[in-house]
């Protein structure tokens, strides 16, 4: 039995709160059950040096976790003077996922940076970050359209992500920490709102998984992401 008696294909309750902070062009608190991530999108009329003069924009991301987002305190990475490998991997994943649904040529020389800060972690922080960042980025782009700095929407659709895995021989969608820590297979799937794959990260932590099990996991991810996209659209419609 899953926590909260969820069905195997059921995602955790989602809450997306827009305009969560006062200053960012896009600000979202996204909650997947007990996992909570603050996603702030910042607009700069500037691009990295290597993009200057090309008439293209850029989307990037940063990821971090508050020291007491977990059961025991984690030391701030700033205190050690460098980011950890996991942090760098996750923020690159978030940025790639966001860029996959943006026409950078339409942006002109504008950069959007989305900061994803985990304030409470109960599994699926990177997937929650991507799903929340998509809404924050949409709000930031809408602010550019409203101000006339953009004439056309460069965002081609939503992007969302979910974790899936095999726990006790059962394929499950949207793993909580207690499930993730016991999983034989753990996978993160990122997709566009029309069901196209952006990234699949999958590892057999224990028993190797079969092709049939892979297809089961991808089917669960497809349904879960469709449910997340519905929540994203509903939040933006408010």
Curated annotation (Swiss-Prot):
Residues annotated to bind phosphate: 86, 124-126
Catalysed reactions, as listed in the record: tRNA(n+1) + phosphate = tRNA(n) + a ribonucleoside 5'-diphosphate
Keyword RNA-binding assigned: yes
Domain of life, per lineage: Bacteria
Record GO terms (molecular function): 3'-5'-RNA exonuclease activity; tRNA binding; tRNA nucleotidyltransferase activity
Top enzyme category: transferase
InterPro entries: ExoRNase_PH_dom1, ExoRNase_PH_dom2, ExoRNase_PH_dom2_sf, PNPase/RNase_PH_dom_sf, Ribosomal_Su5_D2-typ_SF, RNase_PH, RNase_PH_bac-type, RNase_PH_CS
Pfam family membership, one: RNase_PH
Key words, A-Z: Nucleotidyltransferase, RNA-binding, rRNA processing, Transferase, tRNA processing, tRNA-binding
Keyword presence, Nucleotidyltransferase: yes
This enzyme's EC code(s): 2.7.7.56
Record GO biological process: rRNA catabolic process; rRNA processing; tRNA processing
Similarity-based family: Belongs to the RNase PH family.
Quaternary context: Homohexameric ring arranged as a trimer of dimers.
PANTHER family: EXOSOME COMPLEX COMPONENT (PTHR11953), EXOSOME COMPLEX COMPONENT RRP41 (PTHR11953:SF0)
Function: Phosphorolytic 3'-5' exoribonuclease that plays an important role in tRNA 3'-end maturation. Removes nucleotide residues following the 3'-CCA terminus of tRNAs; can also add nucleotides to the ends of RNA molecules by using nucleoside diphosphates as substrates, but this may not be physiologically important. Probably plays a role in initiation of 16S rRNA degradation (leading to ribosome degradation) during starvation.
NCBIfam families: RNasePH
Protein name in the entry: Ribonuclease PH
Gene: rph
């Amino acid at each position: 039995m899953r926590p909260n008696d969820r069905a195997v294909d059921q995602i955790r309750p989602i809450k997306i709160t827009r305009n969560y902070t006062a200053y960012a062009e896009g600000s979202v608190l996204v909650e997947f059950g007990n996992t909570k991530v603050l996603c702030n999108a910042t607009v700069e009329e500037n691009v990295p040096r290597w993009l200057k003069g090309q008439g293209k924009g850029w989307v990037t991301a940063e990821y971090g976790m508050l020291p007491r987002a977990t059961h025991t305190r984690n030391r701030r990475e700033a205190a050690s003077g460098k980011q950890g490998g996991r942090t760098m991997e996750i923020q690159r994943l978030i940025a790639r996922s966001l860029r996959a649904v943006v026409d950078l040529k339409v942006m002109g020389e504008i950069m959007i940076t989305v900061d994803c800060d985990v304030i409470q972690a109960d599994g699926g922080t990177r997937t929650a970050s991507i799903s929340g960042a998509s809404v924050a980025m949409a709000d930031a782009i809408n602010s550019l359209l409203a101000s006339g700095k953009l004439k056309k929407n460069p965002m081609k659709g939503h992007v969302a992500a979910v974790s899936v895995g095999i726990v006790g021989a059962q394929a499950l969608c949207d793993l909580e920490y207690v499930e993730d820590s016991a999983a034989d297979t753990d996978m993160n799937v990122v997709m566009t709102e029309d069901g196209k794959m952006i990234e699949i990260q999958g590892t057999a932590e224990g028993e190797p998984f079969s092709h049939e099990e892979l297809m089961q996991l991808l089917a669960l991810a497809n349904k879960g992401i469709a449910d997340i996209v519905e929540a994203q659209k509903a939040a933006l419609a408010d």
